[in-house]
A protein has these predicted regions:
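Charge-rich, low-complexity N-terminal segments
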Residues: 1-44
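Catalytic core of tubulin tyrosine ligase-like
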Residues: 26-75, 80-90
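Extended soluble regions of mature proteins
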Residues: 55-66, 78, 98, 128, ...
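A broadly tuned preference for mixed-charge, low-complexity surface segments
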Residues: 58, 84-92, 130-133, 156-171
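Short acidic, Pro/Gly- and aromatic-enriched capping/linker segments at domain boundaries
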Residues: 88-107
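A hydrophobic, small-residue-rich beta->alpha segment in the mid-to-C-terminal subdomain
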Residues: 103-146
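Cysteine/selenocysteine-centered motifs that mediate thiol-based redox chemistry or coordinate metal-sulfur cofactors
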Residues: 140-194
Length: 194
């Protein structure tokens, strides 16, 4: 595979596309995807799963040490930005997932966390942007993720998939936005998770 395209749908209309070259892909085996890219000296590692209702982004330095960010209006600095999302669907050199609004921000200790955007999740339900099945699975995914964090297993869980160590992550490619209408794998009523 020369490149991998990661389609990340943020309903109702924002389909973001991230492109990764072969050097960025650390794992892609149908069950999990792990990619990383350098954003000006800070490395962003992205984990997506075929059987879990969340994705996780981790910031490190090039030596593999965790780096915390403080981005307003978030109430805590964080290293792990966990998105409740549909499981990824792989299609040739692309993966697709739908962000389901709820975020879990976790500090570098892997234990201190904050759950945010639950109000946006409620609004999405009211607007019909996700199905009842997706809403129930999102709640279960949030419970599973919090359980991993509270059992002090987040770092071990991610390290088992791909150890944290020094990296030669290539520079990130620019993110693009594309029309949702062209991609039924993320469109309401036709996506597999609906």
């Amino acid at each position: 595979m020369d490149r991998l395209l990661d389609y990340d749908f943020h309903p109702p209309d924002d389909l973001r596309v991230f492109m990764y070259g072969q050097q960025s892909v650390l794992r892609s085996d149908g069950t999990a995807l792990v990619v990383e890219a350098d954003y000006g000296g800070t490395v962003l590692r992205h984990y997506a799963f075929a059987d879990r209702w969340f994705k996780i982004n981790v910031t490190t330095d090039r030596a593999g040490n965790f780096v915390e960010e403080q981005a307003d209006p978030n109430p805590i600095p964080f290293c792990f930005n966990c998105d409740i999302a549909t499981p990824m669907v792989a299609d040739r050199n692309a993966v697709f997932a739908v962000d389901l609004w709820v975020d879990v921000l976790v500090r570098a200790d892997g234990l201190t966390y904050y759950v945010g955007d639950e109000d946006e999740f409620a609004d999405a339900m009211a607007n019909g942007w996700l199905s009842e099945r997706e809403a129930d699975a999102a709640r279960a995914g949030l419970t599973e993720l919090i359980d991993i964090i509270e059992r002090k297993q987040l770092i071990a869980f991610l390290s088992e998939l791909q150890p944290f160590r020094s990296t030669e992550a290539p520079p990130a490619n620019a993110m693009r936005r594309v029309p949702v209408s062209r991609f039924p794998l993320v469109h309401p009523y036709s996506r597999p998770s609906w």
